[in-house]
Amino acid sequence: MVKVFFVLAVLSSIISYINIDPMKSSFFLIFSLLFSMPVISMSMHIWFSYFICLLFLSGIFVILVYFSSLSKINVVKSYMAVFLLLLSMLYFSPTVLTYSSYLGLSGFYYSIYWFIFCFILVCLLFFMNFSSYFLNFSGALRKV
């Protein structure tokens, strides 16, 4: 069941990468978050999945505020979507980890979650990079 949620999360994130409309792309990113929460909550700490959920949803709503008012969208075909889908299915497939030594809050700072931190950071950086590229350099950030 965990692998089904993982496959659905990866598929919805790939669809958000392919989709050009910022509203639909944010919608599919929210779906990918909802499908990845059972996978993350199967680890040691349940509070960590809620923490990721709050941070990710606040970022999605910031993306909606900045990008939904922009009307010039440059259509670019994405040929890397199938490669990214296969790479994420092969490399990031979930395994249920059972640790009993890191049950405290201090386990948050150890090397267990560094992979998850780096993966989420890379996904968000790629999304922001390609979203600003697809918007035809019309200004994804506020001008001073």
UniProtKB/Swiss-Prot annotation:
Enzyme class name: translocase
GO molecular function: NADH dehydrogenase (ubiquinone) activity
Transmembrane portions of the chain: 1-21, 25-45, 46-66, 79-99, 108-128
Keywords: Electron transport, Membrane, Mitochondrion, NAD, Respiratory chain, Translocase, Transmembrane, Transmembrane helix, Transport, Ubiquinone
Localization in the cell: Mitochondrion membrane
Topology term for the membrane: Multi-pass membrane protein
Annotated EC: 7.1.1.2
GO cellular component assignments: mitochondrial membrane
Catalytic activity: a ubiquinone + NADH + 5 H(+)(in) = a ubiquinol + NAD(+) + 4 H(+)(out)
Major localisation: mitochondrion
GO BP annotations, alphabetical order: mitochondrial electron transport, NADH to ubiquinone
Known role: Core subunit of the mitochondrial membrane respiratory chain NADH dehydrogenase (Complex I) that is believed to belong to the minimal assembly required for catalysis. Complex I functions in the transfer of electrons from NADH to the respiratory chain. The immediate electron acceptor for the enzyme is believed to be ubiquinone.
Protein family per UniProt: Belongs to the complex I subunit 6 family.
Name used for this protein in its record: NADH-ubiquinone oxidoreductase chain 6
Phylogenetic placement of the source organism: Eukaryota, Metazoa, Ecdysozoa, Nematoda, Chromadorea
Gene name linked to the record: nduo-6
